[in-house]
Swiss-Prot record:
One of its GO terms (biological process) is arachidonate secretion. One of its GO terms (cellular component) is extracellular region. Belongs to the phospholipase A2 family. Group I subfamily. D49 sub-subfamily. Expressed by the venom gland. One of its GO terms (molecular function) is calcium ion binding. CDD domains: PLA2c (cd00125). The lineage of its organism: Eukaryota, Metazoa, Chordata, Craniata, Vertebrata. This is Neutral phospholipase A2 homolog taipoxin beta chain 2. Disulfide bonds join 11-71, 27-117, 29-45, 44-98, 51-91, 60-84, 78-89.
Length: 118
C-alpha cells in the first residue's frame, strides 16, 4: 500500500530525505500521472504508475494491498505470499530502487502540473 511504499522509499534512499518529498514531484510522483516526465526521477514514478495499472488489470488494489517486506542493509526485500501482494511489492520495490538511484531536483517539487504536465 502507499504507506508501505513510503517506508520502502525511505529505506532505499537511506533516509536522505522524507518520502513526502516525492509526493508532489514532477508529473508522476503524486496524484497527477500525466504528460511527459520532467526528469529520470519522475520517470521512475511513471513506471510505478504503469506497474500499478497492470496490477489493477489483474484484480489487485495496489494502493490498499498490504504486503510483507524487510528493510535490509543491502536493500529492500519482498516476502509476500499472495499473487497481489507479490505483484504490488515488486512494483514498489522497483520504484524505490529507481528513486534511490536518481538525483532529486528541488525545482521539480510542487510544480504547476496544469501547465507542465499536459
Amino acid at each position: 500500500n502507499l504507506v508501505q511504499f513510503g517506508f520502502m522509499i525511505e529505506c532505499a534512499i537511506r533516509n536522505r530525505r522524507p518520502a513526502l518529498d516525492f509526493m508532489n514531484y514532477g508529473c508522476y510522483c503524486g496524484t497527477v500521472g500525466r504528460g511527459t516526465p520532467v526528469d529520470d526521477l519522475d520517470r521512475c514514478c511513471q513506471v510505478h504508475d504503469e506497474c500499478y495499472a497492470t496490477a489493477e488489470k489483474h484484480g489487485c488494489y495496489p494502493s490498499l494491498t498490504t504486503y510483507q517486506w524487510e528493510c535490509r542493509q543491502v536493500g529492500n526485500e519482498c516476502n509476500s505470499k499472495t499473487q497481489c501482494e507479490v505483484f504490488v511489492c515488486a512494483c514498489d520495490l522497483a520504484a524505490a530502487k529507481c528513486l534511490a538511484q536518481e538525483d532529486y531536483n528541488p525545482a521539480h517539487f510542487n510544480i504547476n502540473t496544469g501547465e507542465r504536465c499536459k
